[in-house]
A protein has these predicted regions:
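A conserved acidic beta->alpha catalytic loop
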Residues: 55, 59, 67-76, 90, ...
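Acidic helix N-cap motif at the loop->helix transition within catalytic regions
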Residues: 50, 72-81, 122
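Short aromatic/hydrophobic "clamp" motif used to bind/position activated sugar donors
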Residues: 110
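Catalytic-site signature of metal-activated, phosphate-bearing donor transferases
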Residues: 95-102, 120-290
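Cell-envelope/extracellular polymer assembly enzymes that use nucleotide-activated donors
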Residues: 35-37
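Short, well-formed alpha-helical segments that are part of the catalytic scaffolds
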Residues: 39-58
Length: 294
């Protein structure tokens, strides 16, 4: 949506509110609640934030950007996609930072995306599961390690990497006490859904030195820098070549690769069906246990 169209749409909405107040003699006319809010935390992410925002724009009713003091062009890029940009000083706790971001979201559902990630073009197939009774949809994340010949890590630390990213906007759902790799609370029932995909760009954008610095920062915050995840070169299971600091348009380079396009648009029905069945079995078992108590 262009800036002109967006402003025109907002003015029409405002006009409808005023007319409704006059006709129906109401104090406040409440507009319909947005369906999907997208939350992205940022700080100096000018190299990747455009990929994240561009990928979610077709699906988001609102995009919330929570920044903690960017000094580069991150906010300039974010302003092209949303006017809902907030600032909160980072106090060494990612869980608290995300909880603040969640409080700014008004949609019925919230999708949390990291600033160095993007979603595949089949994300819409994931959204159909939002009406199936779950409070949380867990998605698979793939850590891309090469764009010259599309590949992602398949080591134990990187695959399967299930991420709790689609959550119902429920005040009972929040991030817990973990300072790093924060843990979501009160998210059941949850579905592991292999329909849409999240792609992680960290290994393309950052060389070994930058990733080692990040791992050390996380270790300082929480006593666990997750070196197996961020520094696979140090471990014997590392077998894939990584292409660091690639050409500026990563998505264009990736989508020239036919195998990536096929992967991006693929939905693994078997995994999703398996997880749905597991949830149904757990539900039935819980009902049976409750019945037996009486």
């Amino acid at each position: 949506m262009t800036e002109y169209k967006r402003i025109s749409f907002c003015l029409v909405q405002e006009g409808i509110c005023v007319i409704a107040k006059e006709i129906f003699n109401v104090g406040d006319f409440i507009m319909p609640q947005p369906f999907l809010s997208v939350l992205i935390l940022t700080k100096n992410n000018q190299r990747s934030i455009n990929y994240a925002l561009m990928s979610v724009q077709p699906y988001a009713d609102e995009i919330i950007v929570l920044d903690s003091g960017s000094q580069d062009k991150t906010l300039e890029i974010a302003n092209r996609y949303t006017d809902k940009i907030y600032f909160r000083e980072f106090e060494g706790h990612f869980g608290q930072q995300k909880n603040y971001g969640l409080s700014k979201c008004t949609g019925k559902w919230i999708f949390i995306l990291d600033s160095d990630e993007f979603i595949g073009e089949n994300f819409a197939t994931t959204l159909k599961y939002l009406h199936s009774g779950f409070k949380c949809i867990t998605m698979l994340r793939y850590h891309i390690c090469s764009i010259s010949q599309w590949s992602h890590f398949v080591t134990k630390a990187h695959y399967y990497d299930w991420q709790k990213r689609l959550i119902k906007n429920d005040s009972n759902i929040f991030y817990g006490n973990n300072k790093v790799h924060e843990n979501l609370q009160n998210y059941s029932p949850r579905l592991h859904c292999a329909a849409g995909h999240i792609f992680h760009l960290d290994f393309l954008l950052h060389d070994y030195t930058a990733r080692a610095k990040k791992s050390a920062f996380y270790d300082h915050l929480a006593g666990g820098g997750y070196p197996q995840l961020y520094l696979p070169e140090n471990y014997p299971y590392y077998t894939m070549p990584m292409q660091e600091l690639p050409e500026p348009d990563i998505l264009q380079a990736l989508r020239r690769d036919k195998s990536f396009r096929e992967f991006e648009l693929r939905e693994n029905y078997f995994i999703t069906l398996r997880e749905c069945c597991k949830w149904k079995v757990r539900q039935a078992a819980t009902s049976l246990r409750v019945a037996l108590k009486f």
